[in-house]
Each structure stands twice: as C-alpha cells, then as structure tokens.
Amino acid sequence: MKEKIILIASWLCVLLTMVMIFCFSAEDAEKSTQTSAGVREDVLDTGLPDEQVTPELVSKLQFPFRKMAHFGIFMLLGFCLSNAFERTIQKKWYISYPCSLICGILYAISDEWHQNFSFGRGPTIKDVLIDSAGVLIGISVFVLFIYIFNSIKAKKSIK
C-alpha cells in the first residue's frame, strides 16, 4: 500500500510540474516578462546591495534569467519523470531513464508549440534545446541521488 501511495505521489509531482510549465507558457509576452522581472529583481535584491542594481544590469540579465528559469523548471520535470518511471518500471533503468528523457523532450517541444498560441510569444529551437538539457540534467541528478542512496544503504547493510 505504501509503495502505491509513493507511486501516485511521484506521478502527481510530474503532473504538477507539467501544469506549472503549461501555466507559465500560457502567459502572454507582457505577463511573462513581468513574472521573470519580479523573480530577477528578488534575486538581485537578495544578492547585491541596492546601489549595484542598476537598470542596465537588470536589463542585461533579463535573457539569462529567463533561460535559467526554462532550464530549471525542466530540470525539475526531468527529476520528477525519472522518479516516477523508476517506481513504475522497477529495476529497469535502461527503460525508465530513456522514457524520462523522451517524455521530457516531447513536453519541451509541446511547450514551445503551446507558446505559439500566447500573444507576443513564439516557439524557438533554442528553448527546446535549453529545456531538453534541463530534463537531461534533472535525470542525471536523480541518477546521482539513487547512486548515493544505494551506496549508503549498501554500507549500512555490511555493518
């Protein structure tokens, strides 16, 4: 019963991440810019003194912040997909990780296509590549966590 609940929770995390991505992609260009500007300003306010946060700096960092947001949210998706597929296709990493990558890339493509319907926005191959890289890194982080967890578990069982 516990495993079934964890499996459902794992897929729920995937679904919630996908919904979050969908909602961000549904924003028109102006709203999307405001959202990322708010986050960017919060980060800059936290990391730099007020006198160093100039309008030029804020403007200069707009593009990198937006791309890091793309990368980060798709990294989360890759991690969640890996967890869900790992629990669904137990002990078959050679199936679960490629499935995670394929699903993540397909979602990145569909996300860019979806942006085509949001006013002032459009799809770019660059964003698909950034999103796909995020998925791949998310899967890699998950694999690393599993490796570390299994190593610790094995050491405890030896003692």
Each predicted region: which residue ranges?
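Membrane-helix interface segments
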Residues: 3-8, 90-98, 121-125
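Small-polar-interrupted transmembrane alpha-helices in polytopic inner-membrane proteins
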Residues: 16-21, 96-116
